[in-house]
């Protein structure tokens, strides 16, 4: 079936709507054409489409951008103003250094003596010329000496390797190779950046700006002429200076009456500050005095308590401590005593806790088993030792031997139970005398005299009843010391340099060398 002959199934209402829409568009086109021919441009119809989230800007962005532009313009304006002021000052300074003053009165206003500076500069130029002349004369005098000619620098083989001078963006003279010059200039331009035109936001030309500035200066000069003659202050000559002087600077008014009022206000504030400072210091002194009185009361209470307890020395020291710290002069350091060569002998007697009970030190408690095994081992070693390798018998004369030797001495006829205690003490004295005579050649005479005095002074004391009791307990103490691993205190020795002197005075003698 042919498609072209297929009937369209369209309602009559849709055809009417289509004709109406076509007629409306034709009428709008005719109106726009007539308005365009008449020179009237119709405004486009606003679209009611909702903006997307990507096209929507934050609130206040446009205002902040405008504010930044205004601030940038103000900064550029202040920069131009300060630059112009500096250029004017530089020109004025050049004129002054050359001596071009308008009149003599203005010359007296400046603190710098430019006339003297000109004279000094002329003197420096004259001295420079004189030095050059002296150098030339010296060169003429040294013509006889051989001077090697300077070697000329050969030209470069490659023209790109030639050294050239250029000026960078900061006005500095630089030198580089010719082949590197384009890259350096390009980098200099990138570092310099594009500067914004300061006059882009204003419609005033340079001539108009200069005219406004001239009018302002004329106005200021007229006001200065109307004022009576008087002192010149810093605000009078500042002339809208762009420099910021900080928070410590107070800009006084140029009017004299208002200036005096401002100065009076500042003086009043200064006096108030001084009064508050003095009041604060007085309050601090009162607090300090109250604290000192409280401390003195506490100190007196403590002194009273110490005196009640019977500590008079500490109480006096506490009372005099404050006076000594505040009023006493600095005492001289005590002289350091010189070392003497004398030998001081200190006699120390071992005291047991109870008579008949051996004294055990704190660090020796619990060591009985260990020292017992050690003494047993030593006894076995002595039994295994060859008598030929034993030490001489002189080493053990007048001394108690360890476990095996002490038992032999106790079983010997000299210390047999059949003898009395006075006989044992007499035998011990004989042994000590024999040892002293044997070592008389080695012991110094001072030590011999001291040992004789000790033996002579203690001999009658041994006959007393108290020493007899000590002699009766000597065997017990010796046995206890041998068990503890501590050497017996009965045979006493006086150690002096490399020799020893036995003594049976019942004391340990330890020498202290000063």
Swiss-Prot record:
Tell me which UniProt keywords the record has, alphabetically. Coiled coil, Nucleus
Here the segments flagged for biased composition (Basic and acidic residues) are 63-83, 335-354, 376-388, 420-429
- Kindly state one GO CC term assigned in the UniProt record: nucleus
For bias type Polar residues, the affected ranges are 405-418
**Pfam family example for this protein?**
CCDC174_GRSR
Quote the biased-composition stretches of kind Acidic residues, using this chain's numbering.
141-162
Q: Where in the cell is it found?
A: Nucleus
Residue runs in coiled coils: 66-98, 203-227, 266-321
Keyword Coiled coil tagged: yes
- From the UniProt entry, list the residue stretches annotated as the region Disordered: 42-83, 137-162, 270-291, 306-490
Q: Does the keyword Coiled coil apply?
A: yes
Note the PANTHER family from the entry: COILED-COIL DOMAIN-CONTAINING PROTEIN 174
User: What does this chain do?
Assistant: Probably involved in neuronal development.
Name the UniProt record assigns to this protein: Coiled-coil domain-containing protein 174
């Amino acid at each position: 079936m042919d498609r072209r002959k297929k009937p369209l199934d369209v309602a009559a209402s849709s055809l009417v709507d289509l004709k109406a829409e076509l007629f409306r568009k034709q009428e709008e086109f005719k109106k726009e054409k007539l308005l365009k021919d008449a020179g009237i441009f119709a405004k486009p119809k606003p679209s009611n489409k909702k903006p997307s989230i990507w096209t929507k800007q934050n609130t206040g962005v446009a205002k902040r951008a405008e504010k930044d532009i205004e601030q940038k313009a103000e900064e550029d304006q202040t920069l131009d103003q300060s630059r112009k002021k500096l250029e004017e000052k530089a020109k004025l300074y050049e004129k002054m250094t050359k001596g071009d003053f308008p009149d003599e009165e203005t010359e007296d206003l400046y603190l710098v003596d430019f006339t003297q500076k000109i004279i000094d500069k002329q003197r420096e130029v004259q001295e420079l010329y004189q030095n050059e002349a002296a150098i030339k004369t010296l060169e003429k005098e040294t013509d006889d000496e051989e001077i090697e000619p300077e070697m000329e620098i050969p030209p470069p083989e490659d023209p790109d390797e030639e050294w050239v001078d250029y000026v960078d963006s900061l006005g500095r003279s630089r030198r580089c190779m010719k082949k590197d010059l384009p890259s350096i200039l390009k980098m200099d331009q990138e570092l310099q950046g594009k500067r914004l035109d300061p006059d882009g936001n204003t419609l005033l030309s340079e001539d108009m700006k200069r005219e406004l500035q001239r009018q302002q200066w004329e106005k200021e000069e007229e006001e200065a002429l109307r004022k009576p003659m008087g002192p010149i202050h810093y605000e009078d000559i500042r002339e809208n200076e762009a420099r910021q002087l900080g928070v410590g600077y107070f800009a006084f008014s140029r009017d004299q009456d208002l200036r005096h009022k401002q100065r009076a206000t500042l003086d009043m504030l200064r006096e108030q500050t001084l009064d508050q400072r003095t009041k604060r210091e007085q309050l601090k002194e009162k607090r300090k005095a109250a604290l000192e009185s409280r401390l003195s009361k506490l100190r007196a209470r403590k002194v009273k308590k110490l005196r009640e307890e019977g500590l008079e020395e500490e109480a006096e020291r506490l009372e005099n401590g404050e006076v000594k710290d505040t009023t006493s002069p600095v005492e001289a350091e005590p002289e350091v005593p010189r070392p003497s060569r004398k030998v001081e002998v200190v006699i120390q007697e071992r005291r047991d806790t109870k008579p008949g009970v051996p004294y055990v030190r704190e660090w020796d408690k619990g060591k009985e088993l260990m020292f017992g095994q050690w003494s047993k081992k030593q006894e076995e070693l002595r039994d295994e030792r060859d008598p030929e390798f034993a030490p001489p018998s002189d080493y053990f004369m007048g001394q108690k031997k360890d476990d095996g030797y002490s038992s032999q001495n106790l079983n010997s006829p000299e210390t047999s139970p059949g003898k009395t205690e006075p006989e044992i003490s007499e035998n011990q004295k004989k042994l000590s005398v024999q040892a002293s005579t044997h070592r008389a050649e080695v012991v110094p005479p001072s030590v011999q005299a001291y040992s004789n005095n000790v033996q002579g002074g203690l001999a009658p004391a041994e006959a007393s009843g108290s020493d007899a009791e000590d002699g009766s307990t000597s065997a017990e103490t010796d046995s206890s010391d041998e068990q503890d691993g501590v050497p017996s205190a009965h045979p006493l020795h006086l150690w002096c340099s490399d020799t020893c002197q036995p003594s049976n005075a019942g004391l340990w003698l330890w020498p202290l060398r000063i």
